[in-house]
UniProtKB/Swiss-Prot annotation:
Family according to the record: Belongs to the Maf family. YhdE subfamily.
Cofactor annotation: a divalent metal cation
Enzyme type, top EC level: hydrolase
Pfam families: Maf
GO CC annotation: cytoplasm
Sites marked Important for substrate specificity: 12, 73, 155
Matches recorded under Gene3D superfamilies: 3.90.950.10
Protein name (Swiss-Prot/TrEMBL): dTTP/UTP pyrophosphatase
Membrane-crossing residue ranges in chain numbering: none
Length: 200
Protein backbone atom coordinates (compact mmCIF):
# COMPACT_ATOMS: atom_id res chain seq x y z
CA UNK A 1 0.00 0.00 0.00
CA UNK A 2 1.41 3.42 -0.88
CA UNK A 3 2.09 5.99 1.82
CA UNK A 4 -0.44 8.83 1.79
CA UNK A 5 0.59 12.46 2.07
CA UNK A 6 -1.73 15.44 2.48
CA UNK A 7 -0.47 18.58 0.74
CA UNK A 8 -2.44 21.02 2.86
CA UNK A 9 -1.96 23.30 5.83
CA UNK A 10 -5.66 23.20 6.67
CA UNK A 11 -6.40 21.77 10.13
CA UNK A 12 -9.95 21.09 8.96
CA UNK A 13 -8.77 18.81 6.15
CA UNK A 14 -6.47 16.99 8.56
CA UNK A 15 -9.37 16.40 10.93
CA UNK A 16 -11.65 15.15 8.16
CA UNK A 17 -9.09 12.74 6.74
CA UNK A 18 -8.40 11.42 10.24
CA UNK A 19 -12.15 10.95 10.72
CA UNK A 20 -12.32 8.26 8.01
CA UNK A 21 -9.46 6.26 9.49
CA UNK A 22 -6.71 6.94 6.96
CA UNK A 23 -3.14 7.46 8.23
CA UNK A 24 -1.23 10.22 6.44
CA UNK A 25 1.67 12.64 6.68
CA UNK A 26 1.26 16.38 6.12
CA UNK A 27 3.36 18.05 3.42
CA UNK A 28 3.82 21.72 2.68
CA UNK A 29 2.96 22.59 -0.93
CA UNK A 30 3.06 26.25 -1.91
CA UNK A 31 1.57 27.18 -5.28
CA UNK A 32 0.33 30.37 -6.90
CA UNK A 33 -3.42 30.57 -6.23
CA UNK A 34 -4.14 33.51 -8.54
CA UNK A 35 -7.17 32.75 -10.74
CA UNK A 36 -6.64 32.81 -14.51
CA UNK A 37 -8.62 35.27 -16.60
CA UNK A 38 -12.04 33.81 -17.51
CA UNK A 39 -11.35 30.65 -15.45
CA UNK A 40 -14.52 29.02 -14.15
CA UNK A 41 -14.76 28.30 -10.41
CA UNK A 42 -14.78 24.54 -11.11
CA UNK A 43 -11.66 24.75 -13.28
CA UNK A 44 -9.99 26.94 -10.66
CA UNK A 45 -10.48 24.59 -7.70
CA UNK A 46 -9.54 21.55 -9.80
CA UNK A 47 -6.34 23.22 -11.01
CA UNK A 48 -5.32 24.23 -7.49
CA UNK A 49 -6.11 20.84 -5.93
CA UNK A 50 -4.08 19.03 -8.59
CA UNK A 51 -1.31 21.63 -8.41
CA UNK A 52 -0.97 21.14 -4.65
CA UNK A 53 -0.85 17.35 -5.02
CA UNK A 54 1.77 17.53 -7.77
CA UNK A 55 3.85 20.06 -5.84
CA UNK A 56 3.78 17.77 -2.82
CA UNK A 57 4.80 14.75 -4.89
CA UNK A 58 7.73 16.66 -6.37
CA UNK A 59 9.43 17.05 -2.98
CA UNK A 60 9.33 13.31 -2.18
CA UNK A 61 12.12 10.89 -3.15
CA UNK A 62 11.51 9.49 -6.64
CA UNK A 63 11.86 5.91 -5.44
CA UNK A 64 9.25 6.25 -2.70
CA UNK A 65 5.87 4.59 -3.24
CA UNK A 66 3.72 7.57 -2.37
CA UNK A 67 0.34 9.07 -3.12
CA UNK A 68 -0.30 12.77 -2.49
CA UNK A 69 -3.65 14.43 -1.91
CA UNK A 70 -4.44 18.07 -2.60
CA UNK A 71 -7.71 19.94 -2.16
CA UNK A 72 -9.12 23.39 -2.70
CA UNK A 73 -12.40 25.06 -1.79
CA UNK A 74 -14.10 28.11 -3.27
CA UNK A 75 -17.19 29.97 -2.17
CA UNK A 76 -19.04 31.29 -5.22
CA UNK A 77 -21.75 33.97 -5.33
CA UNK A 78 -23.24 35.09 -8.64
CA UNK A 79 -20.41 33.36 -10.48
CA UNK A 80 -17.73 35.24 -8.53
CA UNK A 81 -15.21 33.48 -6.29
CA UNK A 82 -15.08 34.84 -2.75
CA UNK A 83 -11.60 34.15 -1.44
CA UNK A 84 -10.21 34.61 2.04
CA UNK A 85 -10.96 38.13 3.32
CA UNK A 86 -7.98 40.50 3.31
CA UNK A 87 -9.28 42.59 6.22
CA UNK A 88 -12.36 43.34 8.33
CA UNK A 89 -14.04 45.47 5.68
CA UNK A 90 -13.62 42.70 3.11
CA UNK A 91 -15.01 40.07 5.50
CA UNK A 92 -18.03 42.21 6.38
CA UNK A 93 -18.71 42.88 2.71
CA UNK A 94 -18.63 39.13 1.99
CA UNK A 95 -20.95 38.26 4.86
CA UNK A 96 -23.45 40.95 3.94
CA UNK A 97 -23.37 39.81 0.30
CA UNK A 98 -24.11 36.23 1.44
CA UNK A 99 -26.85 37.40 3.84
CA UNK A 100 -30.28 36.01 3.01
CA UNK A 101 -29.06 34.32 -0.15
CA UNK A 102 -27.95 30.97 -1.55
CA UNK A 103 -24.37 30.48 -2.67
CA UNK A 104 -22.28 27.60 -3.96
CA UNK A 105 -19.30 25.95 -2.33
CA UNK A 106 -17.04 23.99 -4.69
CA UNK A 107 -14.37 21.67 -3.35
CA UNK A 108 -11.98 19.73 -5.54
CA UNK A 109 -9.89 16.85 -4.24
CA UNK A 110 -6.98 15.43 -6.24
CA UNK A 111 -4.77 12.38 -5.80
CA UNK A 112 -1.60 11.66 -7.71
CA UNK A 113 1.25 9.17 -7.69
CA UNK A 114 4.16 8.66 -10.11
CA UNK A 115 1.94 7.13 -12.80
CA UNK A 116 -1.41 8.92 -12.70
CA UNK A 117 -3.66 11.53 -11.20
CA UNK A 118 -7.39 11.83 -10.65
CA UNK A 119 -9.76 14.49 -9.33
CA UNK A 120 -13.29 14.93 -8.05
CA UNK A 121 -15.25 18.18 -7.79
CA UNK A 122 -18.21 18.49 -5.45
CA UNK A 123 -20.63 21.41 -5.56
CA UNK A 124 -22.89 22.17 -2.60
CA UNK A 125 -25.51 24.87 -2.11
CA UNK A 126 -25.68 26.78 1.15
CA UNK A 127 -28.41 29.25 2.09
CA UNK A 128 -27.81 31.90 4.76
CA UNK A 129 -30.54 33.56 6.77
CA UNK A 130 -30.44 37.37 6.81
CA UNK A 131 -27.39 38.54 8.79
CA UNK A 132 -27.41 41.80 10.74
CA UNK A 133 -24.34 44.01 10.44
CA UNK A 134 -23.71 43.81 14.20
CA UNK A 135 -23.67 40.01 13.89
CA UNK A 136 -21.13 40.18 11.07
CA UNK A 137 -18.97 42.55 13.13
CA UNK A 138 -19.16 40.30 16.19
CA UNK A 139 -18.30 37.28 14.05
CA UNK A 140 -15.23 39.06 12.70
CA UNK A 141 -13.97 39.73 16.24
CA UNK A 142 -14.01 35.97 16.90
CA UNK A 143 -11.08 35.60 14.50
CA UNK A 144 -12.81 32.75 12.70
CA UNK A 145 -13.41 34.38 9.28
CA UNK A 146 -9.82 35.48 8.66
CA UNK A 147 -8.46 32.37 6.93
CA UNK A 148 -11.70 30.97 5.51
CA UNK A 149 -12.89 31.05 1.91
CA UNK A 150 -15.96 33.26 1.78
CA UNK A 151 -15.20 34.59 5.24
CA UNK A 152 -16.99 31.92 7.26
CA UNK A 153 -16.65 28.44 8.75
CA UNK A 154 -19.80 26.32 8.56
CA UNK A 155 -18.47 24.02 11.28
CA UNK A 156 -17.83 26.95 13.62
CA UNK A 157 -19.71 29.95 14.94
CA UNK A 158 -21.19 30.69 11.50
CA UNK A 159 -23.37 27.58 11.80
CA UNK A 160 -26.12 29.85 13.16
CA UNK A 161 -26.28 31.65 9.79
CA UNK A 162 -27.03 28.47 7.81
CA UNK A 163 -30.70 28.00 6.92
CA UNK A 164 -30.11 25.07 4.60
CA UNK A 165 -27.53 22.98 2.78
CA UNK A 166 -27.82 20.76 -0.28
CA UNK A 167 -24.81 18.61 -1.03
CA UNK A 168 -21.79 17.59 1.00
CA UNK A 169 -21.36 19.06 4.48
CA UNK A 170 -17.77 17.78 4.67
CA UNK A 171 -17.18 19.27 1.23
CA UNK A 172 -18.20 22.69 2.52
CA UNK A 173 -15.84 22.24 5.47
CA UNK A 174 -13.02 21.43 3.04
CA UNK A 175 -12.89 17.74 2.05
CA UNK A 176 -15.84 15.79 0.60
CA UNK A 177 -15.42 12.47 2.39
CA UNK A 178 -17.58 10.23 0.19
CA UNK A 179 -15.71 11.25 -2.96
CA UNK A 180 -12.36 11.26 -1.14
CA UNK A 181 -12.90 7.66 0.00
CA UNK A 182 -13.75 6.66 -3.58
CA UNK A 183 -10.55 8.26 -4.89
CA UNK A 184 -8.43 6.64 -2.19
CA UNK A 185 -9.87 3.24 -3.10
CA UNK A 186 -8.85 3.73 -6.73
CA UNK A 187 -5.29 4.28 -5.53
CA UNK A 188 -5.31 1.20 -3.28
CA UNK A 189 -5.69 3.06 0.01
CA UNK A 190 -8.60 1.80 2.15
CA UNK A 191 -10.52 3.84 4.69
CA UNK A 192 -11.23 2.68 8.24
CA UNK A 193 -7.67 1.41 8.67
CA UNK A 194 -8.17 2.19 12.37
CA UNK A 195 -10.38 -0.93 12.53
CA UNK A 196 -7.72 -3.33 11.24
CA UNK A 197 -6.72 -5.83 13.88
CA UNK A 198 -9.79 -5.08 16.00
CA UNK A 199 -11.58 -8.42 15.83
CA UNK A 200 -13.55 -8.08 19.05
Amino acid sequence: MPSLYLASGSPRRRELLTQIGVPFTVLSAQIDETPFDHETPAAYVERLALGKAQAGLSVLPAEQQACVMGADTAVVLDGRILGKPVDEADALAMLMALSGREHQVLTAVALCDRQRSDTRIVTSRVRFRPIQIHEAQAYWTSGEPADKAGGYAIQGLAAIFVEGLQGSYSGVVGLPLCETAELLGHFGIPCWQCLEGDKS
